[in-house]
């Protein structure tokens, strides 16, 4: 019988296990057991891109510059401050903030110490934000000073929160009904002599909530391992193709699925980071891109529409920007052609979701596809693209069987991979079906492996890259005493891609008007959720089981033109 080797100094249990494997069992590799941790990304950047700049447009109005070396030092100071406040491993710490250097420090300081960085979308309705903070049981919440009134409104509803930390210095600390802690005071009290703890890579590092399109928002809990692997995948040549030669400006907010992973992927590659803060209008973005010689950006179509409109009116061009990722909602082909033909910027069409960390596919051609006629290339690039390494996808029919990749068959899109959700945070049942995550999207996949989203299995509306719940819109309408029945559907919009149209059956004898009904929404949903228009009808189409036939409604109002005055995020 083979002897069992006893532990000796410096030997880990994993190594002993490898040494003690007997014949007939798998032979494990003998490589270092080093966990994949988010802190390793900022440490790598601080050592190997130490003098590379991080430039931020601050909420206070000025431009802030420092280096990756500075960022890691301050992130460590923040970790020390949080420990002094009593934050422990696994505690959730929220952020209500724009893209800026302090928010980046929170990403690494919170996750690096073993707590969970919970990014919160400030565009949600205050009651939703309060629900999310309470569901996550956040111990502390960081916030940009322009969100002080929002914090004052929700703080009494959030009993778990021990303190609200204003991300500013003492000179700009806002006053309000809530006693605020000062970010800079906390950080400056620490010396930064701190070693990142060696955590389990499966430990949670981040938390994002979905937009609650089918009820209350759901939490998606990312691990250190999933986050680092996603960063590796995002940086690949056939994904975002990031390098130390790039200056990257993420327009997509850091509260929106971790800015599509860029705050992790850019330090991994050592590129320059340019963070735009709250000013996302076309003029502000263009001037910042030009001043900082930005080469790469990422955002939703709505933002790019504003930028292109400004550039046309001002008669200006890009001098350094050469590519941008567009996702969140489908990129209009005309926008893709404008970027490439008029401004020489390559558009990378992408698809993903919160449950995917978020990247799933990106439209990048291989060599053979690049040799096809230009029109054929563009038809591929207008789709949502191919999966990046690490993600697997399939489409299935109503019977659950996998459908062919022929560009014709369409079914429910399902995905799996090391950065795909397994369970929702504090959820009971797993959402997986046979080991796959059902996305709720209906799609086709062509023989080249390019995904195209053709419809949504759930009647949600995506406006400017943000989800709007049709169910919530309908519930408010039905609560009006003059409404007998209501349905909310998506209508095409030239700026926001989609906006809600409310179709209403009035109660007999009710004196109901468009304006009175829309006014009824004030204070009940976020302003940008309020429908753009109301159409009154005698009846709504139903199935034999009494369900609304929204597909028929969408067909009826397919060519409906919404008013030009819209309320959007």
Model-derived segments and spans:
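Gly/Ser/Thr-rich phosphate-binding loop
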Residues: 268, 291-299, 308-379, 392, ...
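AMP-dependent adenylate-forming
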Residues: 41-67, 172-174
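AMP-binding/adenylate-forming catalytic core of the ANL superfamily
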Residues: 124, 130, 141-143, 297, ...
């Amino acid at each position: 019988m083979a002897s069992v080797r006893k532990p000796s100094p410096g030997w880990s249990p994993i190594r002993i296990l490898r040494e003690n494997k007997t014949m007939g069992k798998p032979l494990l590799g003998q490589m270092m057991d080093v966990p994949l941790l988010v802190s390793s990304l900022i440490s790598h950047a601080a050592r190997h891109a130490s003098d590379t700049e991080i430039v931020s447009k601050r909420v206070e109005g000025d431009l802030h510059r420092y280096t990756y070396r500075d960022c890691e030092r301050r992130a460590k100071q923040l970790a020390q401050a949080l420990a002094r406040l009593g934050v422990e491993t696994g505690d959730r710490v929220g952020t209500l903030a724009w893209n800026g250097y302090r928010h980046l420090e929170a990403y690494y300081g919170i996750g690096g110490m073993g707590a969970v960085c919970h990014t919160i979308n400030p565009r949600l309705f205050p009651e939703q934000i309060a629900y999310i903070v309470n569901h996550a049981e956040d111990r502390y919440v960081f916030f940009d000073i322009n969100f002080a009134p929002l914090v004052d409104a929700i703080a009494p509803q959030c009993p778990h929160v021990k303190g609200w930390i204003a991300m500013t210095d003492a000179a700009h600390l806002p006053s309000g009904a809530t006693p605020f802690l000062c970010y800079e005071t906390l950080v400056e009290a620490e010396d930064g002599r701190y070693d990142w703890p060696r955590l389990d890579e499966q430990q949670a590092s981040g938390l994002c909530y979905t937009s609650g399109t089918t009820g209350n928002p759901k939490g998606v809990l990312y691990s250190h391992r999933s986050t680092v692997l996603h960063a590796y995948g995002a940086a690949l040549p056939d994904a975002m193709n990031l390098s130390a030669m790039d200056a990257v400006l993420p327009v997509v907010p850091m509260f929106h699925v971790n800015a599509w992973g860029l705050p992790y992927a850019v330090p991994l590659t050592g590129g320059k980071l340019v963070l735009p803060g709250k000013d996302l209008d076309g003029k502000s973005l263009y001037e910042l891109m030009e001043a900082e010689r930005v080469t790469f950006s990422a955002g939703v179509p709505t933002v790019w529409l504003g930028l292109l409109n400004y550039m046309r009116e001002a008669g200006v061009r890009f001098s350094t920007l050469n590519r941008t990722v567009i996702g969140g909602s489908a990129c209009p082909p005309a926008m893709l052609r404008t970027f490439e033909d008029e401004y020489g910027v390559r558009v990378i069409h992408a698809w993903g979701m919160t449950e995917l960390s978020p990247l799933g596919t990106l439209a990048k051609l291989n060599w053979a596809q690049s040799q096809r006629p230009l029109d054929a290339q563009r038809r591929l690039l207008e789709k949502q693209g191919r999966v990046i390494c690490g993600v697997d996808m399939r489409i299935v029919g109503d019977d659950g069987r996998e459908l062919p990749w022929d560009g014709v068959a369409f079914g429910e899109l399902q995905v799996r991979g090391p950065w795909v959700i397994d369970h929702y945070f504090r959820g009971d049942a797993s959402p997986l079906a046979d080991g796959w995550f059902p996305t709720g999207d209906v799609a086709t996949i062509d023989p080249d492996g390019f995904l195209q989203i053709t419809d949504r299995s759930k009647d949600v509306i995506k406006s400017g890259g943000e989800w709007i719940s049709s169910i919530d819109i309908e519930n408010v309408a039905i609560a009006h005493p003059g409404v007998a029945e209501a349905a909310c559907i998506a209508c095409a919009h030239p700026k926001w891609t989609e906006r809600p149209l409310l179709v209403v059956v009035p109660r007999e004898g009710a004196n109901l008007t468009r304006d009175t009904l829309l006014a009824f929404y004030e204070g009940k949903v976020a302003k940008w959720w309020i429908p753009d228009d109301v159409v009154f009808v005698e009846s709504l189409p139903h199935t034999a089981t009494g369900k609304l036939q929204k597909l028929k409604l969408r067909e009826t109002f397919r060519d409906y033109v919404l008013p030009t005055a819209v309320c959007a995020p």
